[in-house]
Each structure stands twice: as structure tokens, then as C-alpha cells.
A protein has these predicted regions:
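N-terminal hydrophobic/helix-forming segments and targeting peptides
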Residues: 1-198
Length: 198
């Protein structure tokens, strides 16, 4: 299963400076889970399919790598496409900053993951942050803590999704951020939009 805890970019300063308590963690065993609430578990880190979903450790940016590799395999021949597999997104967007200054893109689409809010929040209340859910397609950002996504690019992605009958969702403005936060500051500014896998 997957052990879920509050992501570091959503945690308060006090939560970041202390160990995660066992009772604040959740384990999702999928539909075939036989464990009961309160059972103890150990790690067995393997990539696997659970219904239509996948489970893996450190999937956050790895899923982006898979998406970009697939994009390379099917890239249109009539555009100049540049992909950056960057590092240190969670600790200062450092790799994206270097890549953006090196490549000087005309526009950028940041690919990331975002928390799915299908479960109650960590205090047991209805979860109203982000509004992204599993099974409803990629999440197109409108804004986050470091970026107001370019409305032309947001609309462009929506138009493509509608035309191609691709289910998508708009991620409501909230905390967190993506590499777009640094890419947009390159030169006199770069139009950016982020797309995430919930």
C-alpha cells in the first residue's frame, strides 16, 4: 500500500521540525487490503498497479519523467521542443532555474504531481483545498503560491483537452508550487502553465 502523510510543502514549521506521528499517517492498501485500522506495517517498495492507479516510492517527479519520455516519442515534427529533466524542485526550483536560463524558452509547461483530495484532510474535516481528484484526468493549474499561470496557455490546454475528449480538471489556486515559479522569471518573463498528475 501507500503510506500517506502531509507533503512537506503543505506542512507547518512545527510539523517540519518534528517526526511524523504514527497516528497522522494513513495506509491505502487498495480494494484488496485485508489490514484493519491500527495494524502495524513494514516497507516493501515495489512498483505496482492497483486497479487503474500505480503505486511507487518517490513517484512525484518520476511520473513527470515518464510523461516527458512519452512526449518525446510522439512529439510533433513541426515544433522546436526542448525538455528539461530538472532536480531540486522541492528545495528551491534550482534545476528549473538553470535550465530556463540555458534554453531561454518562448513558453514553458511544467509537469509535476499534485495531492489528490479524495480523502478528508489530516484533521478529519472535509478537504476543500486544491479540489483535484483521482480518475478525473490531469490537473491544469490556474495559480499557486509562486505562479499565476498564463491564461492563454490555460485556455490552450483546455481547448486541446475538449477537442481531443481528454478528461481534465482545473487545480484551484492554493499552496505548493512547480518549476514554473522560476521558469517564468527568465529574461523579461516566460509564459508558463503547470500540468500535474493527481
Amino acid at each position: 500500500g501507500v503510506i500517506g502523510a502531509k507533503p512537506i510543502h503543505l506542512a507547518s514549521r512545527s510539523e517540519l521540525s518534528s517526526a511524523v506521528s504514527v497516528d497522522s499517517m494513513r495506509i491505502d492498501l487498495g480494494p484488496e487490503g485485508k489490514a484493519k485500522i491500527g495494524d502495524r506495517a513494514t516497507f516493501a517498495t515495489k512498483f505496482k498497479h492497483v486497479g487503474p492507479s500505480i503505486i511507487s516510492k518517490a513517484i512525484d517527479n518520476r511520473i513527470g519523467v515518464v510523461i516527458l519520455i512519452e512526449l518525446l516519442k510522439h512529439a510533433p515534427k513541426n515544433i522546436e521542443l526542448c525538455l528539461a529533466f530538472s532536480v531540486q524542485e522541492e528545495i528551491g526550483l534550482r534545476g528549473a532555474k538553470v535550465a530556463a536560463h540555458y534554453f531561454e524558452p518562448d513558453l514553458a509547461i511544467a509537469v509535476d504531481s499534485t495531492p489528490a483530495r479524495d480523502l478528508p484532510d489530516y484533521e478529519g474535516n472535509e478537504n476543500i483545498s486544491y479540489n483535484t481528484k483521482l480518475g478525473f484526468g490531469p490537473a491544469i493549474y490556474v495559480a499557486n503560491s509562486s505562479t499565476i499561470d498564463d491564461p492563454r496557455l490555460v485556455r490552450f490546454l483546455e481547448d486541446i483537452a475538449i477537442k481531443e475528449k481528454i478528461q481534465y480538471q482545473l487545480r484551484q489556486p492554493g499552496g505548493g508550487g512547480t518549476d514554473a515559479g522560476e521558469i517564468q522569471k527568465t529574461r523579461a518573463g516566460v509564459p508558463v502553465v503547470s500540468v500535474s498528475v493527481p
